[in-house]
Regions:
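Generic anion/oxyanion-binding catalytic loop in active/binding sites
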Residues: 1, 38, 67
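Active-site- or DNA-interface-adjacent structural scaffold in DNA-acting proteins
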Residues: 69-135
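Positively charged, low-complexity/disordered segments
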Residues: 1-9
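Single, function-defining residue in the core of a domain
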Residues: 8-56, 64, 77-85, 92-93, ...
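Long, charge-rich C-terminal accessory regions
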Residues: 137-139
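DNA-recognition alpha helix
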Residues: 57-71
Length: 439
């Protein structure tokens, strides 16, 4: 891990950040003036300080990154430097950091998941922030919660974020954003996309198949109004594994009515990958699988994976892996201190979200290369991610050596206990305002 940490730090600091600093005109708002003079905070230090933010105030974070008194800038000076940065600086660093590392696969496929999460942010109650306000159902609570909706593509095997899109909560559309991210192709090809309910869209399925990829999407298991399996000749009771081929169209005429076994009418918007004016009829093959969970509940999965290679039990195991993206949201929000923002400005808030994903990917890349094996015992073990995140943060601050980081990560390992399930409690989350931070 020491060699990996040194190499990873070299890629992050020297190769990527230094190259961006040399070509900083694309990442600053005023190329003729910004970061041209020699100051206490360079282009690299400004970005790295934001990447290593913790739950403390900005002043405390600066002092932890630059502990020497004569070199420590004031909070005001730091914010002036941060204001010079474009959001594209963090996005470019995020994408470039993912490029040089090899990817692990499962069944010769890159197993990816797509999902979104709400991120509560501190904002002033003004009209400009109205689209970020989330309406409260509690009548006693008068203050609205302000949220970003962050949609992500997450590599479940390599445990890192591949792409993300940030939008206001009120206007967010997960299917539209997923389609945009599919067009950007900032993820490894020959991929299997696993998604929860809400992504069962003919447009998305056609777009994924058009790119030569696969999907495994959970849909509503009932045959009620709005269910995708409504209208298909599937048994209402028990389980099934049916592969069907239809010609999908928005047209309703004598031919489509006379041949319901060949044509299926769907209500959908035009898409270059599905039904449009040039192609009013689109032939597509889908596989519908109804499975039963250990608690007796039924779940419907829609996929284009071949039945001879991926039986229902394999699909069930694959879908269970999807929970890793939910775990990553918990880790990045609470263990990596994403929810402890340091500004109310939309631009700075978005910078912090991208910075936390960069930091999360840095840490998981380190833990993926960690080799730890116990000959005795009931369980396999993995690094404690909360501890690993803190150790890697100290390393990026130059506060720990690679040997120290490795030793401290190995000191705190957690057992891998598969198959556990707990009730998912829902709670109301408040943003943490910067007024209540400790220096």
């Amino acid at each position: 891990i020491c060699a990996c940490l040194v190499g990873l730090g070299d890629v992050y600091k020297r190769q990527i950040l230094n190259n961006m600093a040399k070509n900083r005109d694309s990442y600053v708002k005023n190329p003729e003036k910004d970061f041209t003079r020699k100051r206490k905070l360079s282009f690299q230090d400004t970005i790295n300080t934001i990447v290593t933010y913790d739950a403390g105030s900005i002043g405390r974070c600066i002092k932890r990154y630059i502990p020497k008194v004569e070199k420590t800038p004031t909070t005001s000076a730091f914010l002036q430097q941060q204001k010079k940065l474009k959001l594209s600086a963090f996005q470019t660093l995020f994408y470039r950091f993912n490029d040089p590392f090899p990817d692990k696969t499962l069944y010769h496929l890159h197993i990816l998941s797509v999902d979104g999460t709400g991120v509560t942010v501190p904002m002033d109650r003004i009209n400009e922030n109205k689209e970020y306000a989330r309406v409260r159902t509690n009548k006693d609570c008068t203050r609205p919660a302000y949220q970003f909706h962050v949609s992500c593509i997450y590599d479940l095997i390599n445990e890192r974020y591949c792409d993300a899109y940030i939008e206001p909560f009120r206007t967010h559309s997960e299917t539209h954003v997923f389609s945009m991210m599919l067009e950007r192709k900032n993820f490894p090809q020959k991929a299997l996309f696993i998604a929860d309910r809400g992504y069962e869209s003919y447009l998305l399925m056609a777009q994924i198949q058009h790119d030569g990829n696969y999907f495994l999407i959970r849909a509503r298991e009932d045959f009620g109004q709005g269910s995708m399996i409504k209208g298909y000749p599937f048994p209402r009771d028990g389980t099934f594994d049916k592969t069907v081929t239809y010609i999908y169209t928005k047209t309703q005429n004598k031919r489509t009515k006379a041949n319901p076994e060949l044509y299926k009418r769907v209500a959908t918007r035009n898409s270059p990958y599905f039904i449009n004016k040039e192609h009013p009829y689109v032939k597509m093959t889908l596989r519908f699988v109804m499975i039963v969970l250990p608690n007796g509940q039924k779940e419907c999965l829609i996929t284009n994976l071949p039945a001879n290679k991926f039986p229902p039990e394999t699909l069930k195991k694959l879908y269970c892996i999807r929970w890793k993206i939910e775990t990553s949201f918990r880790l990045i929000k609470y263990s990596a201190n994403l929810l402890e923002f340091h500004s109310k400005k939309i631009e700075f808030l978005q910078q912090e979200i991208w910075a936390k994903m960069i930091f999360y990917n840095f840490t998981t890349t380190i833990t993926q290369h960690l080799r730890y094996k116990r000959d005795r015992g009931k369980y396999q073990y993995k690094p404690n991610m909360t501890n690993a995140l803190q150790m890697c943060k100290d390393y990026l601050r130059n506060a720990k050596t690679p040997n120290d980081v490795e030793g401290h990560i190995l000191m705190e390992m957690t057992p891998i206990r598969d198959g556990r399930s707990f009730k998912r409690d829902k709670s109301r989350h408040q943003s943490v305002f910067t007024t209540f931070r400790h220096n």
